[in-house]
Each structure stands twice: as structure tokens, then as C-alpha cells.
Amino acid sequence: GMSPWNMMQSWGVPSINLHAKAYEYANILAAKGLKVVDMSFAGGFALEDSIFKGLALGAPFTKLICMGRGIKIPGFVGSNIEGALFEERRAAVHGHWNELPKSVLTEGSTAKEIFACYFDVEKIVGKDEMKNIPYGAIAFYTLADKLYCGLQQLLAGARKFSVTQLTRDDIFAGNRETARETGIRHMADANDESARKILNS
């Protein structure tokens, strides 16, 4: 992606291969009757669909998805918004904008208008405390709310009531190489057997 040096950019092993191996090795231990520790996957996760896929890919061993850069960005943007709206706070919040860009101004020109979850945070901390809450924190909360809602929608579509119910059968591979590397069924093979049973009944 946008990593500043080669080691992060192209010297490493792609996350999907590491995750596939982690599952493979955990499965070997489980088959021997050994307890497999709860695993977490990291590397490139940014949205609810990637969280869903990561948990399903490592199921039943993966219990946590770690996010780095993807979850930091709202905090940075929130700080930039705060710095643009309050010049006197710009240095303290490490804001880099002198003014709000047009893309933000289309939503509004105050925190209450810009942040979809402003009033949700206000309900938690109280109206008087909102003056002490950094805009980066409000933005971070807003992304967390989006991820929560999106994950609920994906789980509903998969007819699962909890992420602990996810299995590797809840996803399929988009290409043969990924299917081969991960052991996840290719999209042309997923549900093929049940479709043929229906057609031949």
C-alpha cells in the first residue's frame, strides 16, 4: 500500500498466506487433541467485510482481528477537523488543516454536523464533558460504530447470531490460487453439490 519503506511494502509475506498457515498448523494441533490457543489475525484489515473474512478464515481458532493503520485514520482526520475549526488547538491535537476541505464541508461546519456519532458519544460522556473530548476520539468511535453495524449486517446475511458461529464455509475464494493456498472453496465450487442435488431431484 502506502508504506514508507520496502520492508513494509514488499519484503514481507502476504497476510493471507500467514493466516492460512496459522489455521493449517492450529488444525494439526487440534487433530492431535491438543488445546489451540486463541489466535488473532492482523495485516491489512480496515473494514467490516475484511473482519468477517478474517474471523471465518481462521475459524474456529481466530477470536480477534487486529487493526492498525485502518483504525488510526479516523483519529487523524478528526484531529485535522478539530485543528481546522479551532486554530488555537491545532498544535495540541496535531492537526494539519488550516480549513475544512469541501468534502467535509458538504456534511457541515460543526462537530455536531460532521460526526455521525457525535450525539452517541454525548450520551455516554454527558453534554458538559463533550468540550473535553478530542474530535479524533469522536471519529474513532464513529468508525467503531460503522464496523459494528456492518458486521451485524454481514452476520445477518450469513444467518449467524455471533462472530463465534462463523466457519470457513461462510466464505469462498475468488480465485483458484487463493483456494489452493487457503483450503477455502472456490466460488464456483461453493454450494455446487447442493445445487446439483436440487437440479437432479
What label would you give each PLM region?
Residues 1-115:
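Glycine-rich phosphate/ribose-binding loops and adjacent secondary-structure elements
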Residues 73, 104-201:
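C-terminal extensions of enzymes
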